[in-house]
Regions:
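N-terminal capping segment at the start of a domain
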Residues: 1-24, 320, 377-381
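Catalytic-core environment of secreted peptidases
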Residues: 60-116
């Protein structure tokens, strides 16, 4: 692994503006770099569904020994991301364990840095390039770079179920009788390709063992309009119904793995009119299906009871944004990650996340997907930074993961 090169590559990517729906320049840069490493590069047709100016990037590199491994990160960033000026500086860093001086990459302060997720892409590229340059044995390698991840995982959701199947016209060390979908060639249907999503906080060696189901609530409450000063008795306030429902809903942290929130209420037309309609939006999450469905039912019941009691009606709609992904300590993929971390001297930390990532969607499409911490800190803010050693260690980790699957 070339520590200077991974930093240079990251700084180059940071300078490319790539907000959601406008990832084409970043995708073109990545396609060129992957082609230089020997990958066959293609883009899917997801842009028609996502509205992005490019599709998801899918690249394959034939291996020298049987087996297959895949890595994923996302091309898009949140805003503000126009004219990012990356700064490398030394600062005092304190965490739960130590206080130390560390070299970091941060933005000049007016924008995000975009370590989320360009640090993930840079680490994947450097890890793979190091394997290729060293002539080390390697399994077949797939790289997936998604669009619109920051927009409720639109890019990965639009990925066809068979999009990562190894191309029939491309040689593969693991060529065999593969099942359809995201399975590695030569794998039995019960053996989907291990896919590592580099897109979480936490130092390299952090393994996201679980990420929740995510359901979104949209409700429309109907009351009856009336003049608020002349005949309020004739009206039924839709906003009052919404308030009564929210007041009785279990919200916040429900248990150690379940949360719920109402984040948007809108209704009414004027202060002197009893509001005839109101719209409400919320969500619930849990690692476990029975608990998230119970929470969903409780929120629905609160809305229906309030509407009935106060003389209105309500229409409730729930949408599953993505399913949960849960790994156990004894899973093979976790064992391989722990062995790879040990090989490059990284401490392992098992973490459960309250948010989703592309791994949630890709697991539902048949991959054995798991999210890894890459060291990004304060992401989605102008205070975002990443320690240079974390960027370099993540590239080493990618290299070690590839070696682990070449055994």
């Amino acid at each position: 692994m070339n520590p200077d090169r991974v930093l240079e590559s990251f700084l180059e990517m940071v300078a490319i503006e790539s907000p959601s729906w406008h990832e084409a320049p970043m995708a073109a840069c990545c396609a060129e770099k992957l082609a230089e490493m020997g990958f066959t590069v293609a883009f899917d047709a997801s842009a028609a569904e996502t509205g992005s100016d490019t599709g998801n990037l899918i690249a394959h590199l034939p291996g020298t020994v049987p087996g297959r491994v895949a890595f994923s990160a996302h091309l898009d960033t949140v805003k503000p991301c126009a004219g990012i000026e990356a700064v490398v500086e030394t600062r005092h860093i304190c965490d739960d364990v130590t206080c130390r001086m560390a070299e970091v990459v941060c933005s000049a302060g007016d924008t995000i840095l975009s370590a989320d997720d360009k640090a993930g892409i840079a680490a994947i590229f450097e890890g793979v390039r190091s394997v290729v340059e060293s002539d080390a044995v390697r399994p077949d390698i797939t790289v997936l770079l998604t669009t619109c991840e920051e927009q409720s995982l639109l890019g990965s959701s639009a990925l066809a179920d068979d999009a990562l199947a190894w191309p029939a016209d491309l040689p593969a060390a693991s060529r065999g009788t593969a099942a359809e979908g995201l399975l590695g060639d030569g794998a039995a249907p019960s053996e989907p390709v291990p896919l590592f999503v580099l897109d979480a906080d936490g130092a390299p060696g952090t393994i996201i063992m679980g990420a929740p189901y995510h359901w979104t609530l949209r409700a429309r409450i109907e009351g009856r309009a009336a003049h608020a000063g002349v005949e309020p008795e004739e009206g039924v306030s839709a906003i009052q119904i919404a308030a009564a429902a929210v007041a009785t809903m279990p919200l916040g942290r429900i248990d150690e793995c379940t949360t719920a929130n109402v984040g948007h209420i809108e209704g009414g037309v004027a202060v002197n009119i009893v509001p005839a309609a109101c719209e409400l939006e919320g969500e619930c999450r849990s690692l476990y299906e029975d608990r998230v469905l119970a929470q969903r039912d409780a929120m629905t019941a609160a809305l229906e009871e309030a509407a009935e009691r106060l003389g209105g009606t309500v229409e409730v709609a729930w949408e599953l944004d993505y399913p949960a992904v849960v790994h156990e300590a004894g899973d093979a993929i976790v064992g391989h990650l722990e062995a790879a971390a040990a090989a490059c001297g990284l401490p392992v930390c098992h973490v459960v996340s309250g948010g989703g990532a592309d791994a949630n969607v890709l697991s539902a499409k048949g991959a054995d997907a798991i999210t890894l911490g890459i060291g990004m800190t304060n992401f989605h803010s102008t205070d975002e930074y990443i320690e240079v050693t974390d960027l370099q260690n993540m590239a080493r980790y990618v290299e070690a993961i590839i070696a682990e699957y070449a055994c």
